[in-house]
A protein has these predicted regions:
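C-terminal single-pass membrane-anchor helix
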Residues: 1, 194-240
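Residue-level detector of intrinsically disordered, flexible termini
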Residues: 1, 15-16, 171
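Cleavable N-terminal signal peptides of Sec/SRP-targeted secreted and luminal proteins
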Residues: 5-25
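Non-cytosolic ectodomains/luminal loops of secretory-pathway membrane proteins
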Residues: 20-199
Length: 240
């Protein structure tokens, strides 16, 4: 008799745990992240969209951000970003905030960007933001006129004023302010998500190695010609 009651208790506990897990799964937003590159050439716009699913309607009061790691092949111009933030076009934090925009790809380092998302008026559970990115100079290649820069899917971060999604979040090691909430760092949490695509590939135009000699000769001739024209003008019209 005691064994039967013990078995019933175990079954009841198992059902309770299962129902609790199902409740948590239903309460957690099924986040989906999409990345898209706009424009062509070296100067592009990275459009990031986060869809929180049906449970995302409870995200009111939360700040949503995308933590993006940019590889050495691309960068964000901090001066351009400051101008955009001044006009409330794009809001982001660069880590580190000092970026060498002149460095080539093989001398640059990864760049971490915390991109604050804005609610998408076309979707009640969606957030989106665009980040201007620029391709760096790459070494000349053999046989290919394009270098491939791989962008991994960003991490989704939440900064909430309430306890919504508390069971869905994990503390994230990010020191950045919750936009519009305070001026100091706040506690960010990462949200489990599924990327629409694991990675995004950016094609950057590069020169061909077999053209190196021709480029050097043309550059030297152009430099010599310009220097000669300048010296001629100085000697002819200069007052000594």
């Amino acid at each position: 008799m005691a064994g039967g009651r013990r078995g019933e208790a175990l079954v009841g506990a198992g059902l309770a745990a299962l129902l609790c897990a199902l409740h948590v799964q239903a309460a957690c937003p099924d986040a989906t992240v999409t990345q898209e590159l706009l424009k062509d050439g070296f100067h592009r716009d990275l459009l990031v969209t986060v869809e929180l699913g049906a449970a995302g309607e409870d995200a009111g009061g939360c700040v949503v951000a995308a933590r993006i790691r940019l590889p050495p092949g691309i960068y964000v111009d901090p001066y351009e970003l400051a101008s955009l933030q001044q006009h409330n076009v794009t809001k982001a934090v660069l880590i580190p905030d000092a970026v060498d925009v002149e460095a080539p790809e093989y001398l640059a380092a990864d760049l971490l960007v915390l991109l604050y998302m804005e609610p998408d008026p076309r979707c009640s559970c969606c957030f989106r933001a665009a980040l201007p990115v620029h391709g760096r100079y790459h070494r000349p290649a053999d046989g290919s006129e394009e270098a491939l820069v791989v962008l991994k899917s960003p991490q989704v971060l939440l900064c909430c004023c309430h306890n919504h999604f508390a069971e869905c979040r994990k503390p994230a090691e990010v020191e950045a302010p919750c936009l519009g909430k305070n001026v100091g760092p706040c506690r960010w949490h990462s949200l489990t998500h599924k990327p629409a695509h694991e990675e995004l590939i950016l094609q950057v135009p590069v020169g061909l190695r077999q053209h190196s000699s021709l480029v050097c000769v043309v550059t030297l001739l152009s430099t010599a010609l310009c220097a000669t024209l300048i010296l001629t003008a100085v000697c002819k019209y200069g007052h000594f």
